[in-house]
Amino acid sequence: MRILYGVQGTGNGHLSRARVMAKALMEQDIKVDFLFSGRKPDQYFDMQCFGDYRVQTGMTFATHSGRLNLPQTVRQNLSLSLMKDIQALDLSCYDLVLNDFEPISAWAARRQGVPSIGISHQAALIHPVPKMGNTWLNELLLMYFAPVDVALGCHWHHFGFPILPPFVEVVPCSSEHTHQILVYLPFEDVDTIASFLAPFSDYLFLVYHSQQPQVQTAKHIQWYGFNRDGFKQHLASCGGVIGNAGFELASEALTLGKKLLVKPLIGQFEQLSNVAALQLLAAADSMMTLDINVLKRWLKAASPNPIAYPQVGDTLVKWLRGGDWHHSQPLCQELWAQVALPDTWR
């Protein structure tokens, strides 16, 4: 079996899931080529596990000050290059296309009649799971942005549907620094973040961001450019996580038993829906703006117990090899049977 794996590059969560799958596919001797789209080639990092991967433009989302900028998103994606890339992608040597919300490989597979399986958090939102900010446009986006023959979604809870657990790979840590807080708010302005954290000098905030403040900030706020290994180590040892409401970081925090405070990207349906799910499960605190009062209460909160999600990638690859791709319920049941969910989630 030879597979093309298309991955949406706009979010690090897609890349994290692809890393888990790359390892599982390699261990089971399946030939796989990776195609990434959605960000510039020089903005990918720690990509060694993907071998000789390809990068194409694809589609991406524009943001400003913690909000989705829909007009700018439309403007920057109005291009004939996407259609040309879809038409130019030759899939004749592949038996299957795996897809994590990546439009070029998805539409090329549909045009050429190659079987395709979607593995993404977005695919879980096709089911009536908790949602917020949903519109007919969002429903169209879920169905047609990266259409596939079989859609396998992943979520923190199955909610009674054939959904996979999260794909999580975390660094274990023997010691926890309860007064160290990991902060990852990539869509927020750095000066706004600094002002938000400034009053809480009893804590050490480890802030990962692509930019640095123009003026020196307080000593209890440390700034880091994104480094995957350093981020994983800080995530493992911190006492809590403040982030946007992306799926993967929240999954890692839940797996490690870290208290979680999320601020969604306003206007982004997936992140708003993640907030709805976290609220229903009582798994995190949330804020729609960087609210100092919410932060003050959250810092005093206790940490939850960790959730031991299974190694989804290994089981999924075995299922892929079996070839019965239109029957995913047994796969999902097998994986969730290994998860001890909190009593309050049941």
Question: What function would you assign to each model-found segment?
Answer:
Residues 22, 167-171, 175-240:
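Donor-nucleotide binding loops and adjacent catalytic segments primarily
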Residues 250, 254-304:
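Catalytic binding pocket for nucleotide-activated donors in carbohydrate/polymer assembly enzymes
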Residues 97-103, 108, 234-273:
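A donor-sugar binding/catalytic signature common to diverse glycosyltransferases
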Residues 127-189, 207-211:
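A nucleotide-sugar donor-handling region in carbohydrate enzymes
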Residues 8-12, 27-79, 290:
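Conserved nucleotide-sugar phosphate-binding/catalytic loop shared by glycosyltransferases and other
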